[in-house]
Amino acid sequence: MNKQVSGKRARIFAQQVLEIPETPYQQRSLQASLHLFHSLGQKTNFSQAEGVSPSALSRFFNVYDWDSDRCWEEMQDTQWRILLDAARHKRRPRLRLSVDLTTVEKVGTQLPYVSVYNGKHGIHLVVLFAEYGELKFPISYRVYQGKHTSTPVTLALDLLEEVPEWIKKRFQVCVLADSGFEAAAFLEGVQRLGFEFVVGVRSNRRTDHPGRVTVADCPHGGYVNLANWPLETLSLGRVDRGDREFFAVSSELLEGDDILAEGRRRWALESFFKEGKHQFGLAQFALRTAKGLDRWILLVFLAFTLTLLHRSEDMTLQETARLTLYALFPEVRLNHLLSQLQKEQEFLRQHGYSLSYTRCNL
C-alpha cells in the first residue's frame, strides 16, 4: 500500500514539475534535462542532451526566469508527505535526519562558491538527508562559502529548522552527524528543535564526567558529560576499526551497540554522496552562476529521489533510473524515441525503408 501511495504522489509531482516552466521552449529544455540526469552511465554534459542545443540548456540553467524555487518546494513537500504516508499506522515512528558536508572537488575561480576547506578545493555542500525504513531522500542543502561566512554547523541547523512542524509532531526525530558537527552550538541547537541526536566526537573531546578526562578514556556504553556542554548526560559508543577508533554520543542514553547501529545509518547519506557525484552528475557541474548551481543540484536531488522510489533488488541503479524516467515522464521517452528515429532516417533510406508517424487522437 505504501508503494502505491508513494507512486501516486510521485506521478502527481512529476506532472507538476513539467508544468512549472511557462513556455513550450523552456518545457522542452526541462524534459531534455530530466532525460540527461536520469541517463546514468553517460557523462552529464549538455552536448549529450536530445532535442535542444547545449546553448539552450545553458540558458535554461543560468539565465531563464522559470520558477525553480517552486520546483524545490514541490519536491520537498512530496518527500515529506511520502514519509508521512509510510508511517501512517505507526505509533511515534522514528525518522532519521542526517547532516553532513561533502565537497564537489573543483579548481579554478570561474565556478561559483569555490573555496578551500579541510585541504579540499571545490564547492562545499552541507546536505540534509531523510531516512525512514526503505525511504531515503536528499531534502535540501546549503553552500559553505569559506572563512568569515556561516559555518557548516550554522548551515546544518538552518536546514533542520526548515523541517515542517507537522513532521516534528508525527515523528520522533533523531539527527545523525559525524564529528565535524560535535560543537556545543550544534548539540544545543538540535535539542532546542526538540530532536534527539547521535553525533560523532573526537577522541580527545574532554569530559566533566566520569572525570576530567577524554572520551577515549571512557567505556563503551558509559555515561559522559562533555566539558563544554555539561547540560545533559550522554551515553557513549566507541568502535575500533583497526587503524582508528571512532566515538559517538547519544542524547537518548542508548546502549553502546545501539549508538553504533544508529551511526551506521549515516552510510545512507554517504551512499548518496557517492551515487550523486558519480552516477547522477553532481561531480560534473561546470556552470558559472549560482543560479546554475542551484538548478543543477535540484535536478540531481530530483532524479535521485524518483529513482530510489522505484528501486528494486533485481534492478541496477541505471536500469531503475531509465524505468523511472519512462514511467513518470512519458513525454520525455516519446521525444527520445522520435529523436532516435530522426537520426536513423538516412540509414533506413539506404536500405529501402521510409518511416513516417503521426499523432493519434486518443
Which positions does each model-derived feature cover?
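Short secondary-structure boundary/capping segments within folded domains
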Residues: E22, Q48-E50, A86-H89
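A common structural microfeature
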Residues: S33, K43, P54, R94-S98, ...
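Conserved glycine-centered beta->alpha loop in an early N-terminal alpha/beta scaffold
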Residues: F46, V52-S53, R70-C71
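Single, function-defining residue in the core of a domain
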Residues: M1-S33, H38, E73, K106, ...
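Active-site-proximal, Lys/Arg-enriched surface segment
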Residues: V63-G133
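Short capping segments at the starts of secondary-structure elements
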Residues: H38-T44
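Short, basic interhelical loop/turn and adjoining N-cap
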Residues: A49-N62
